[in-house]
Amino acid sequence: SYITNHDQNFNESKKTLTQKYGDNRYPLTVLAYTVYGMPLIYNGQETGGNQALDYFNDTKINWNTQDEKMLNTLRTLFALKHAVSALSDARQSSDNPTTTLLNVSDNTSVLAYTRTLDDSQVLVVLNMGTTATSATVEGITAGEWSLWLDSETIAQGTSRKQTTLNATHTFNLDAKGYRVYVSGTYPEQNVNQHTAIRSIRSSQQDDGRWYTLTGQPILRPTKRGLYIHHGKKIMINQ
């Protein structure tokens, strides 16, 4: 699934994500990465996707123009896609996670659904409307959830917040807002570091250390959560 590709970016009259979707580009990105299938990211999309690339000529991506909201949204979605089995893609379609659309009471602007595989579950709530809204969602698995992606704070950096959701729960969402929850209990993480795209030399060697998602080196994980080790995202459940 994707919201842009090389043909659309080069051939269509509305080439960039902003031209095509406006602020819908944010919740649509979350939708593409969580509803089903394997998502595709096009060149430079993590900078905001607002550059038209000529694939017949050597057009350089402008890495100096960054959309922190899009960058941090994609960083979080990448990590969750790699580490949470409810967002995985199996070799056989019969083994894929189940996508369940949830009922949203009296609000046609909000889409809510879960992805479930065994005891792993992800809840996604998207506001496609142009104004902030309150939406009551039914059919949620009541209990402890961890908020991994929040449109209201993601531009400032990645974070994680623990919360309890009821089977019928009311969410307050900003315009074009989105939330992604993972079932279970994880340590909270505050937004505490500016994030940016950095160049990495191809000759740079793997130092074997563990890193948090904000890039902080640690000796070893001591809490549940997502970490980076040997270039891979690893979820620690203990």
What are these regions (language model features)?
Residues L77, N192-I200, G215, Y227:
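Terminal processing/anchoring signals of secreted or surface-associated proteins
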Residues T185-W210:
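Residue-level detector of functionally pivotal "anchor" positions at catalytic/ligand-binding pockets or at interdomain
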Residues K161-N192:
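C-terminal beta-strand-rich structural cap/linker in extracellular carbohydrate-active enzymes
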Residues L226-Q238:
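C-terminal tail/sorting-segment detector
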Residues M128-G143:
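Surface-exposed beta-strand/loop patches in extracellular or lumenal glycoproteins
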Residues S1-Q19, L28-E68:
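Aromatic/acidic polysaccharide-binding cleft in carbohydrate-active enzymes
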Residues G139-I154:
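Solvent-exposed beta-hairpin/edge-strand motifs
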Residues Y42, G49-V122, M128, V182, ...:
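Glycan-recognition and catalytic regions of carbohydrate-active enzymes
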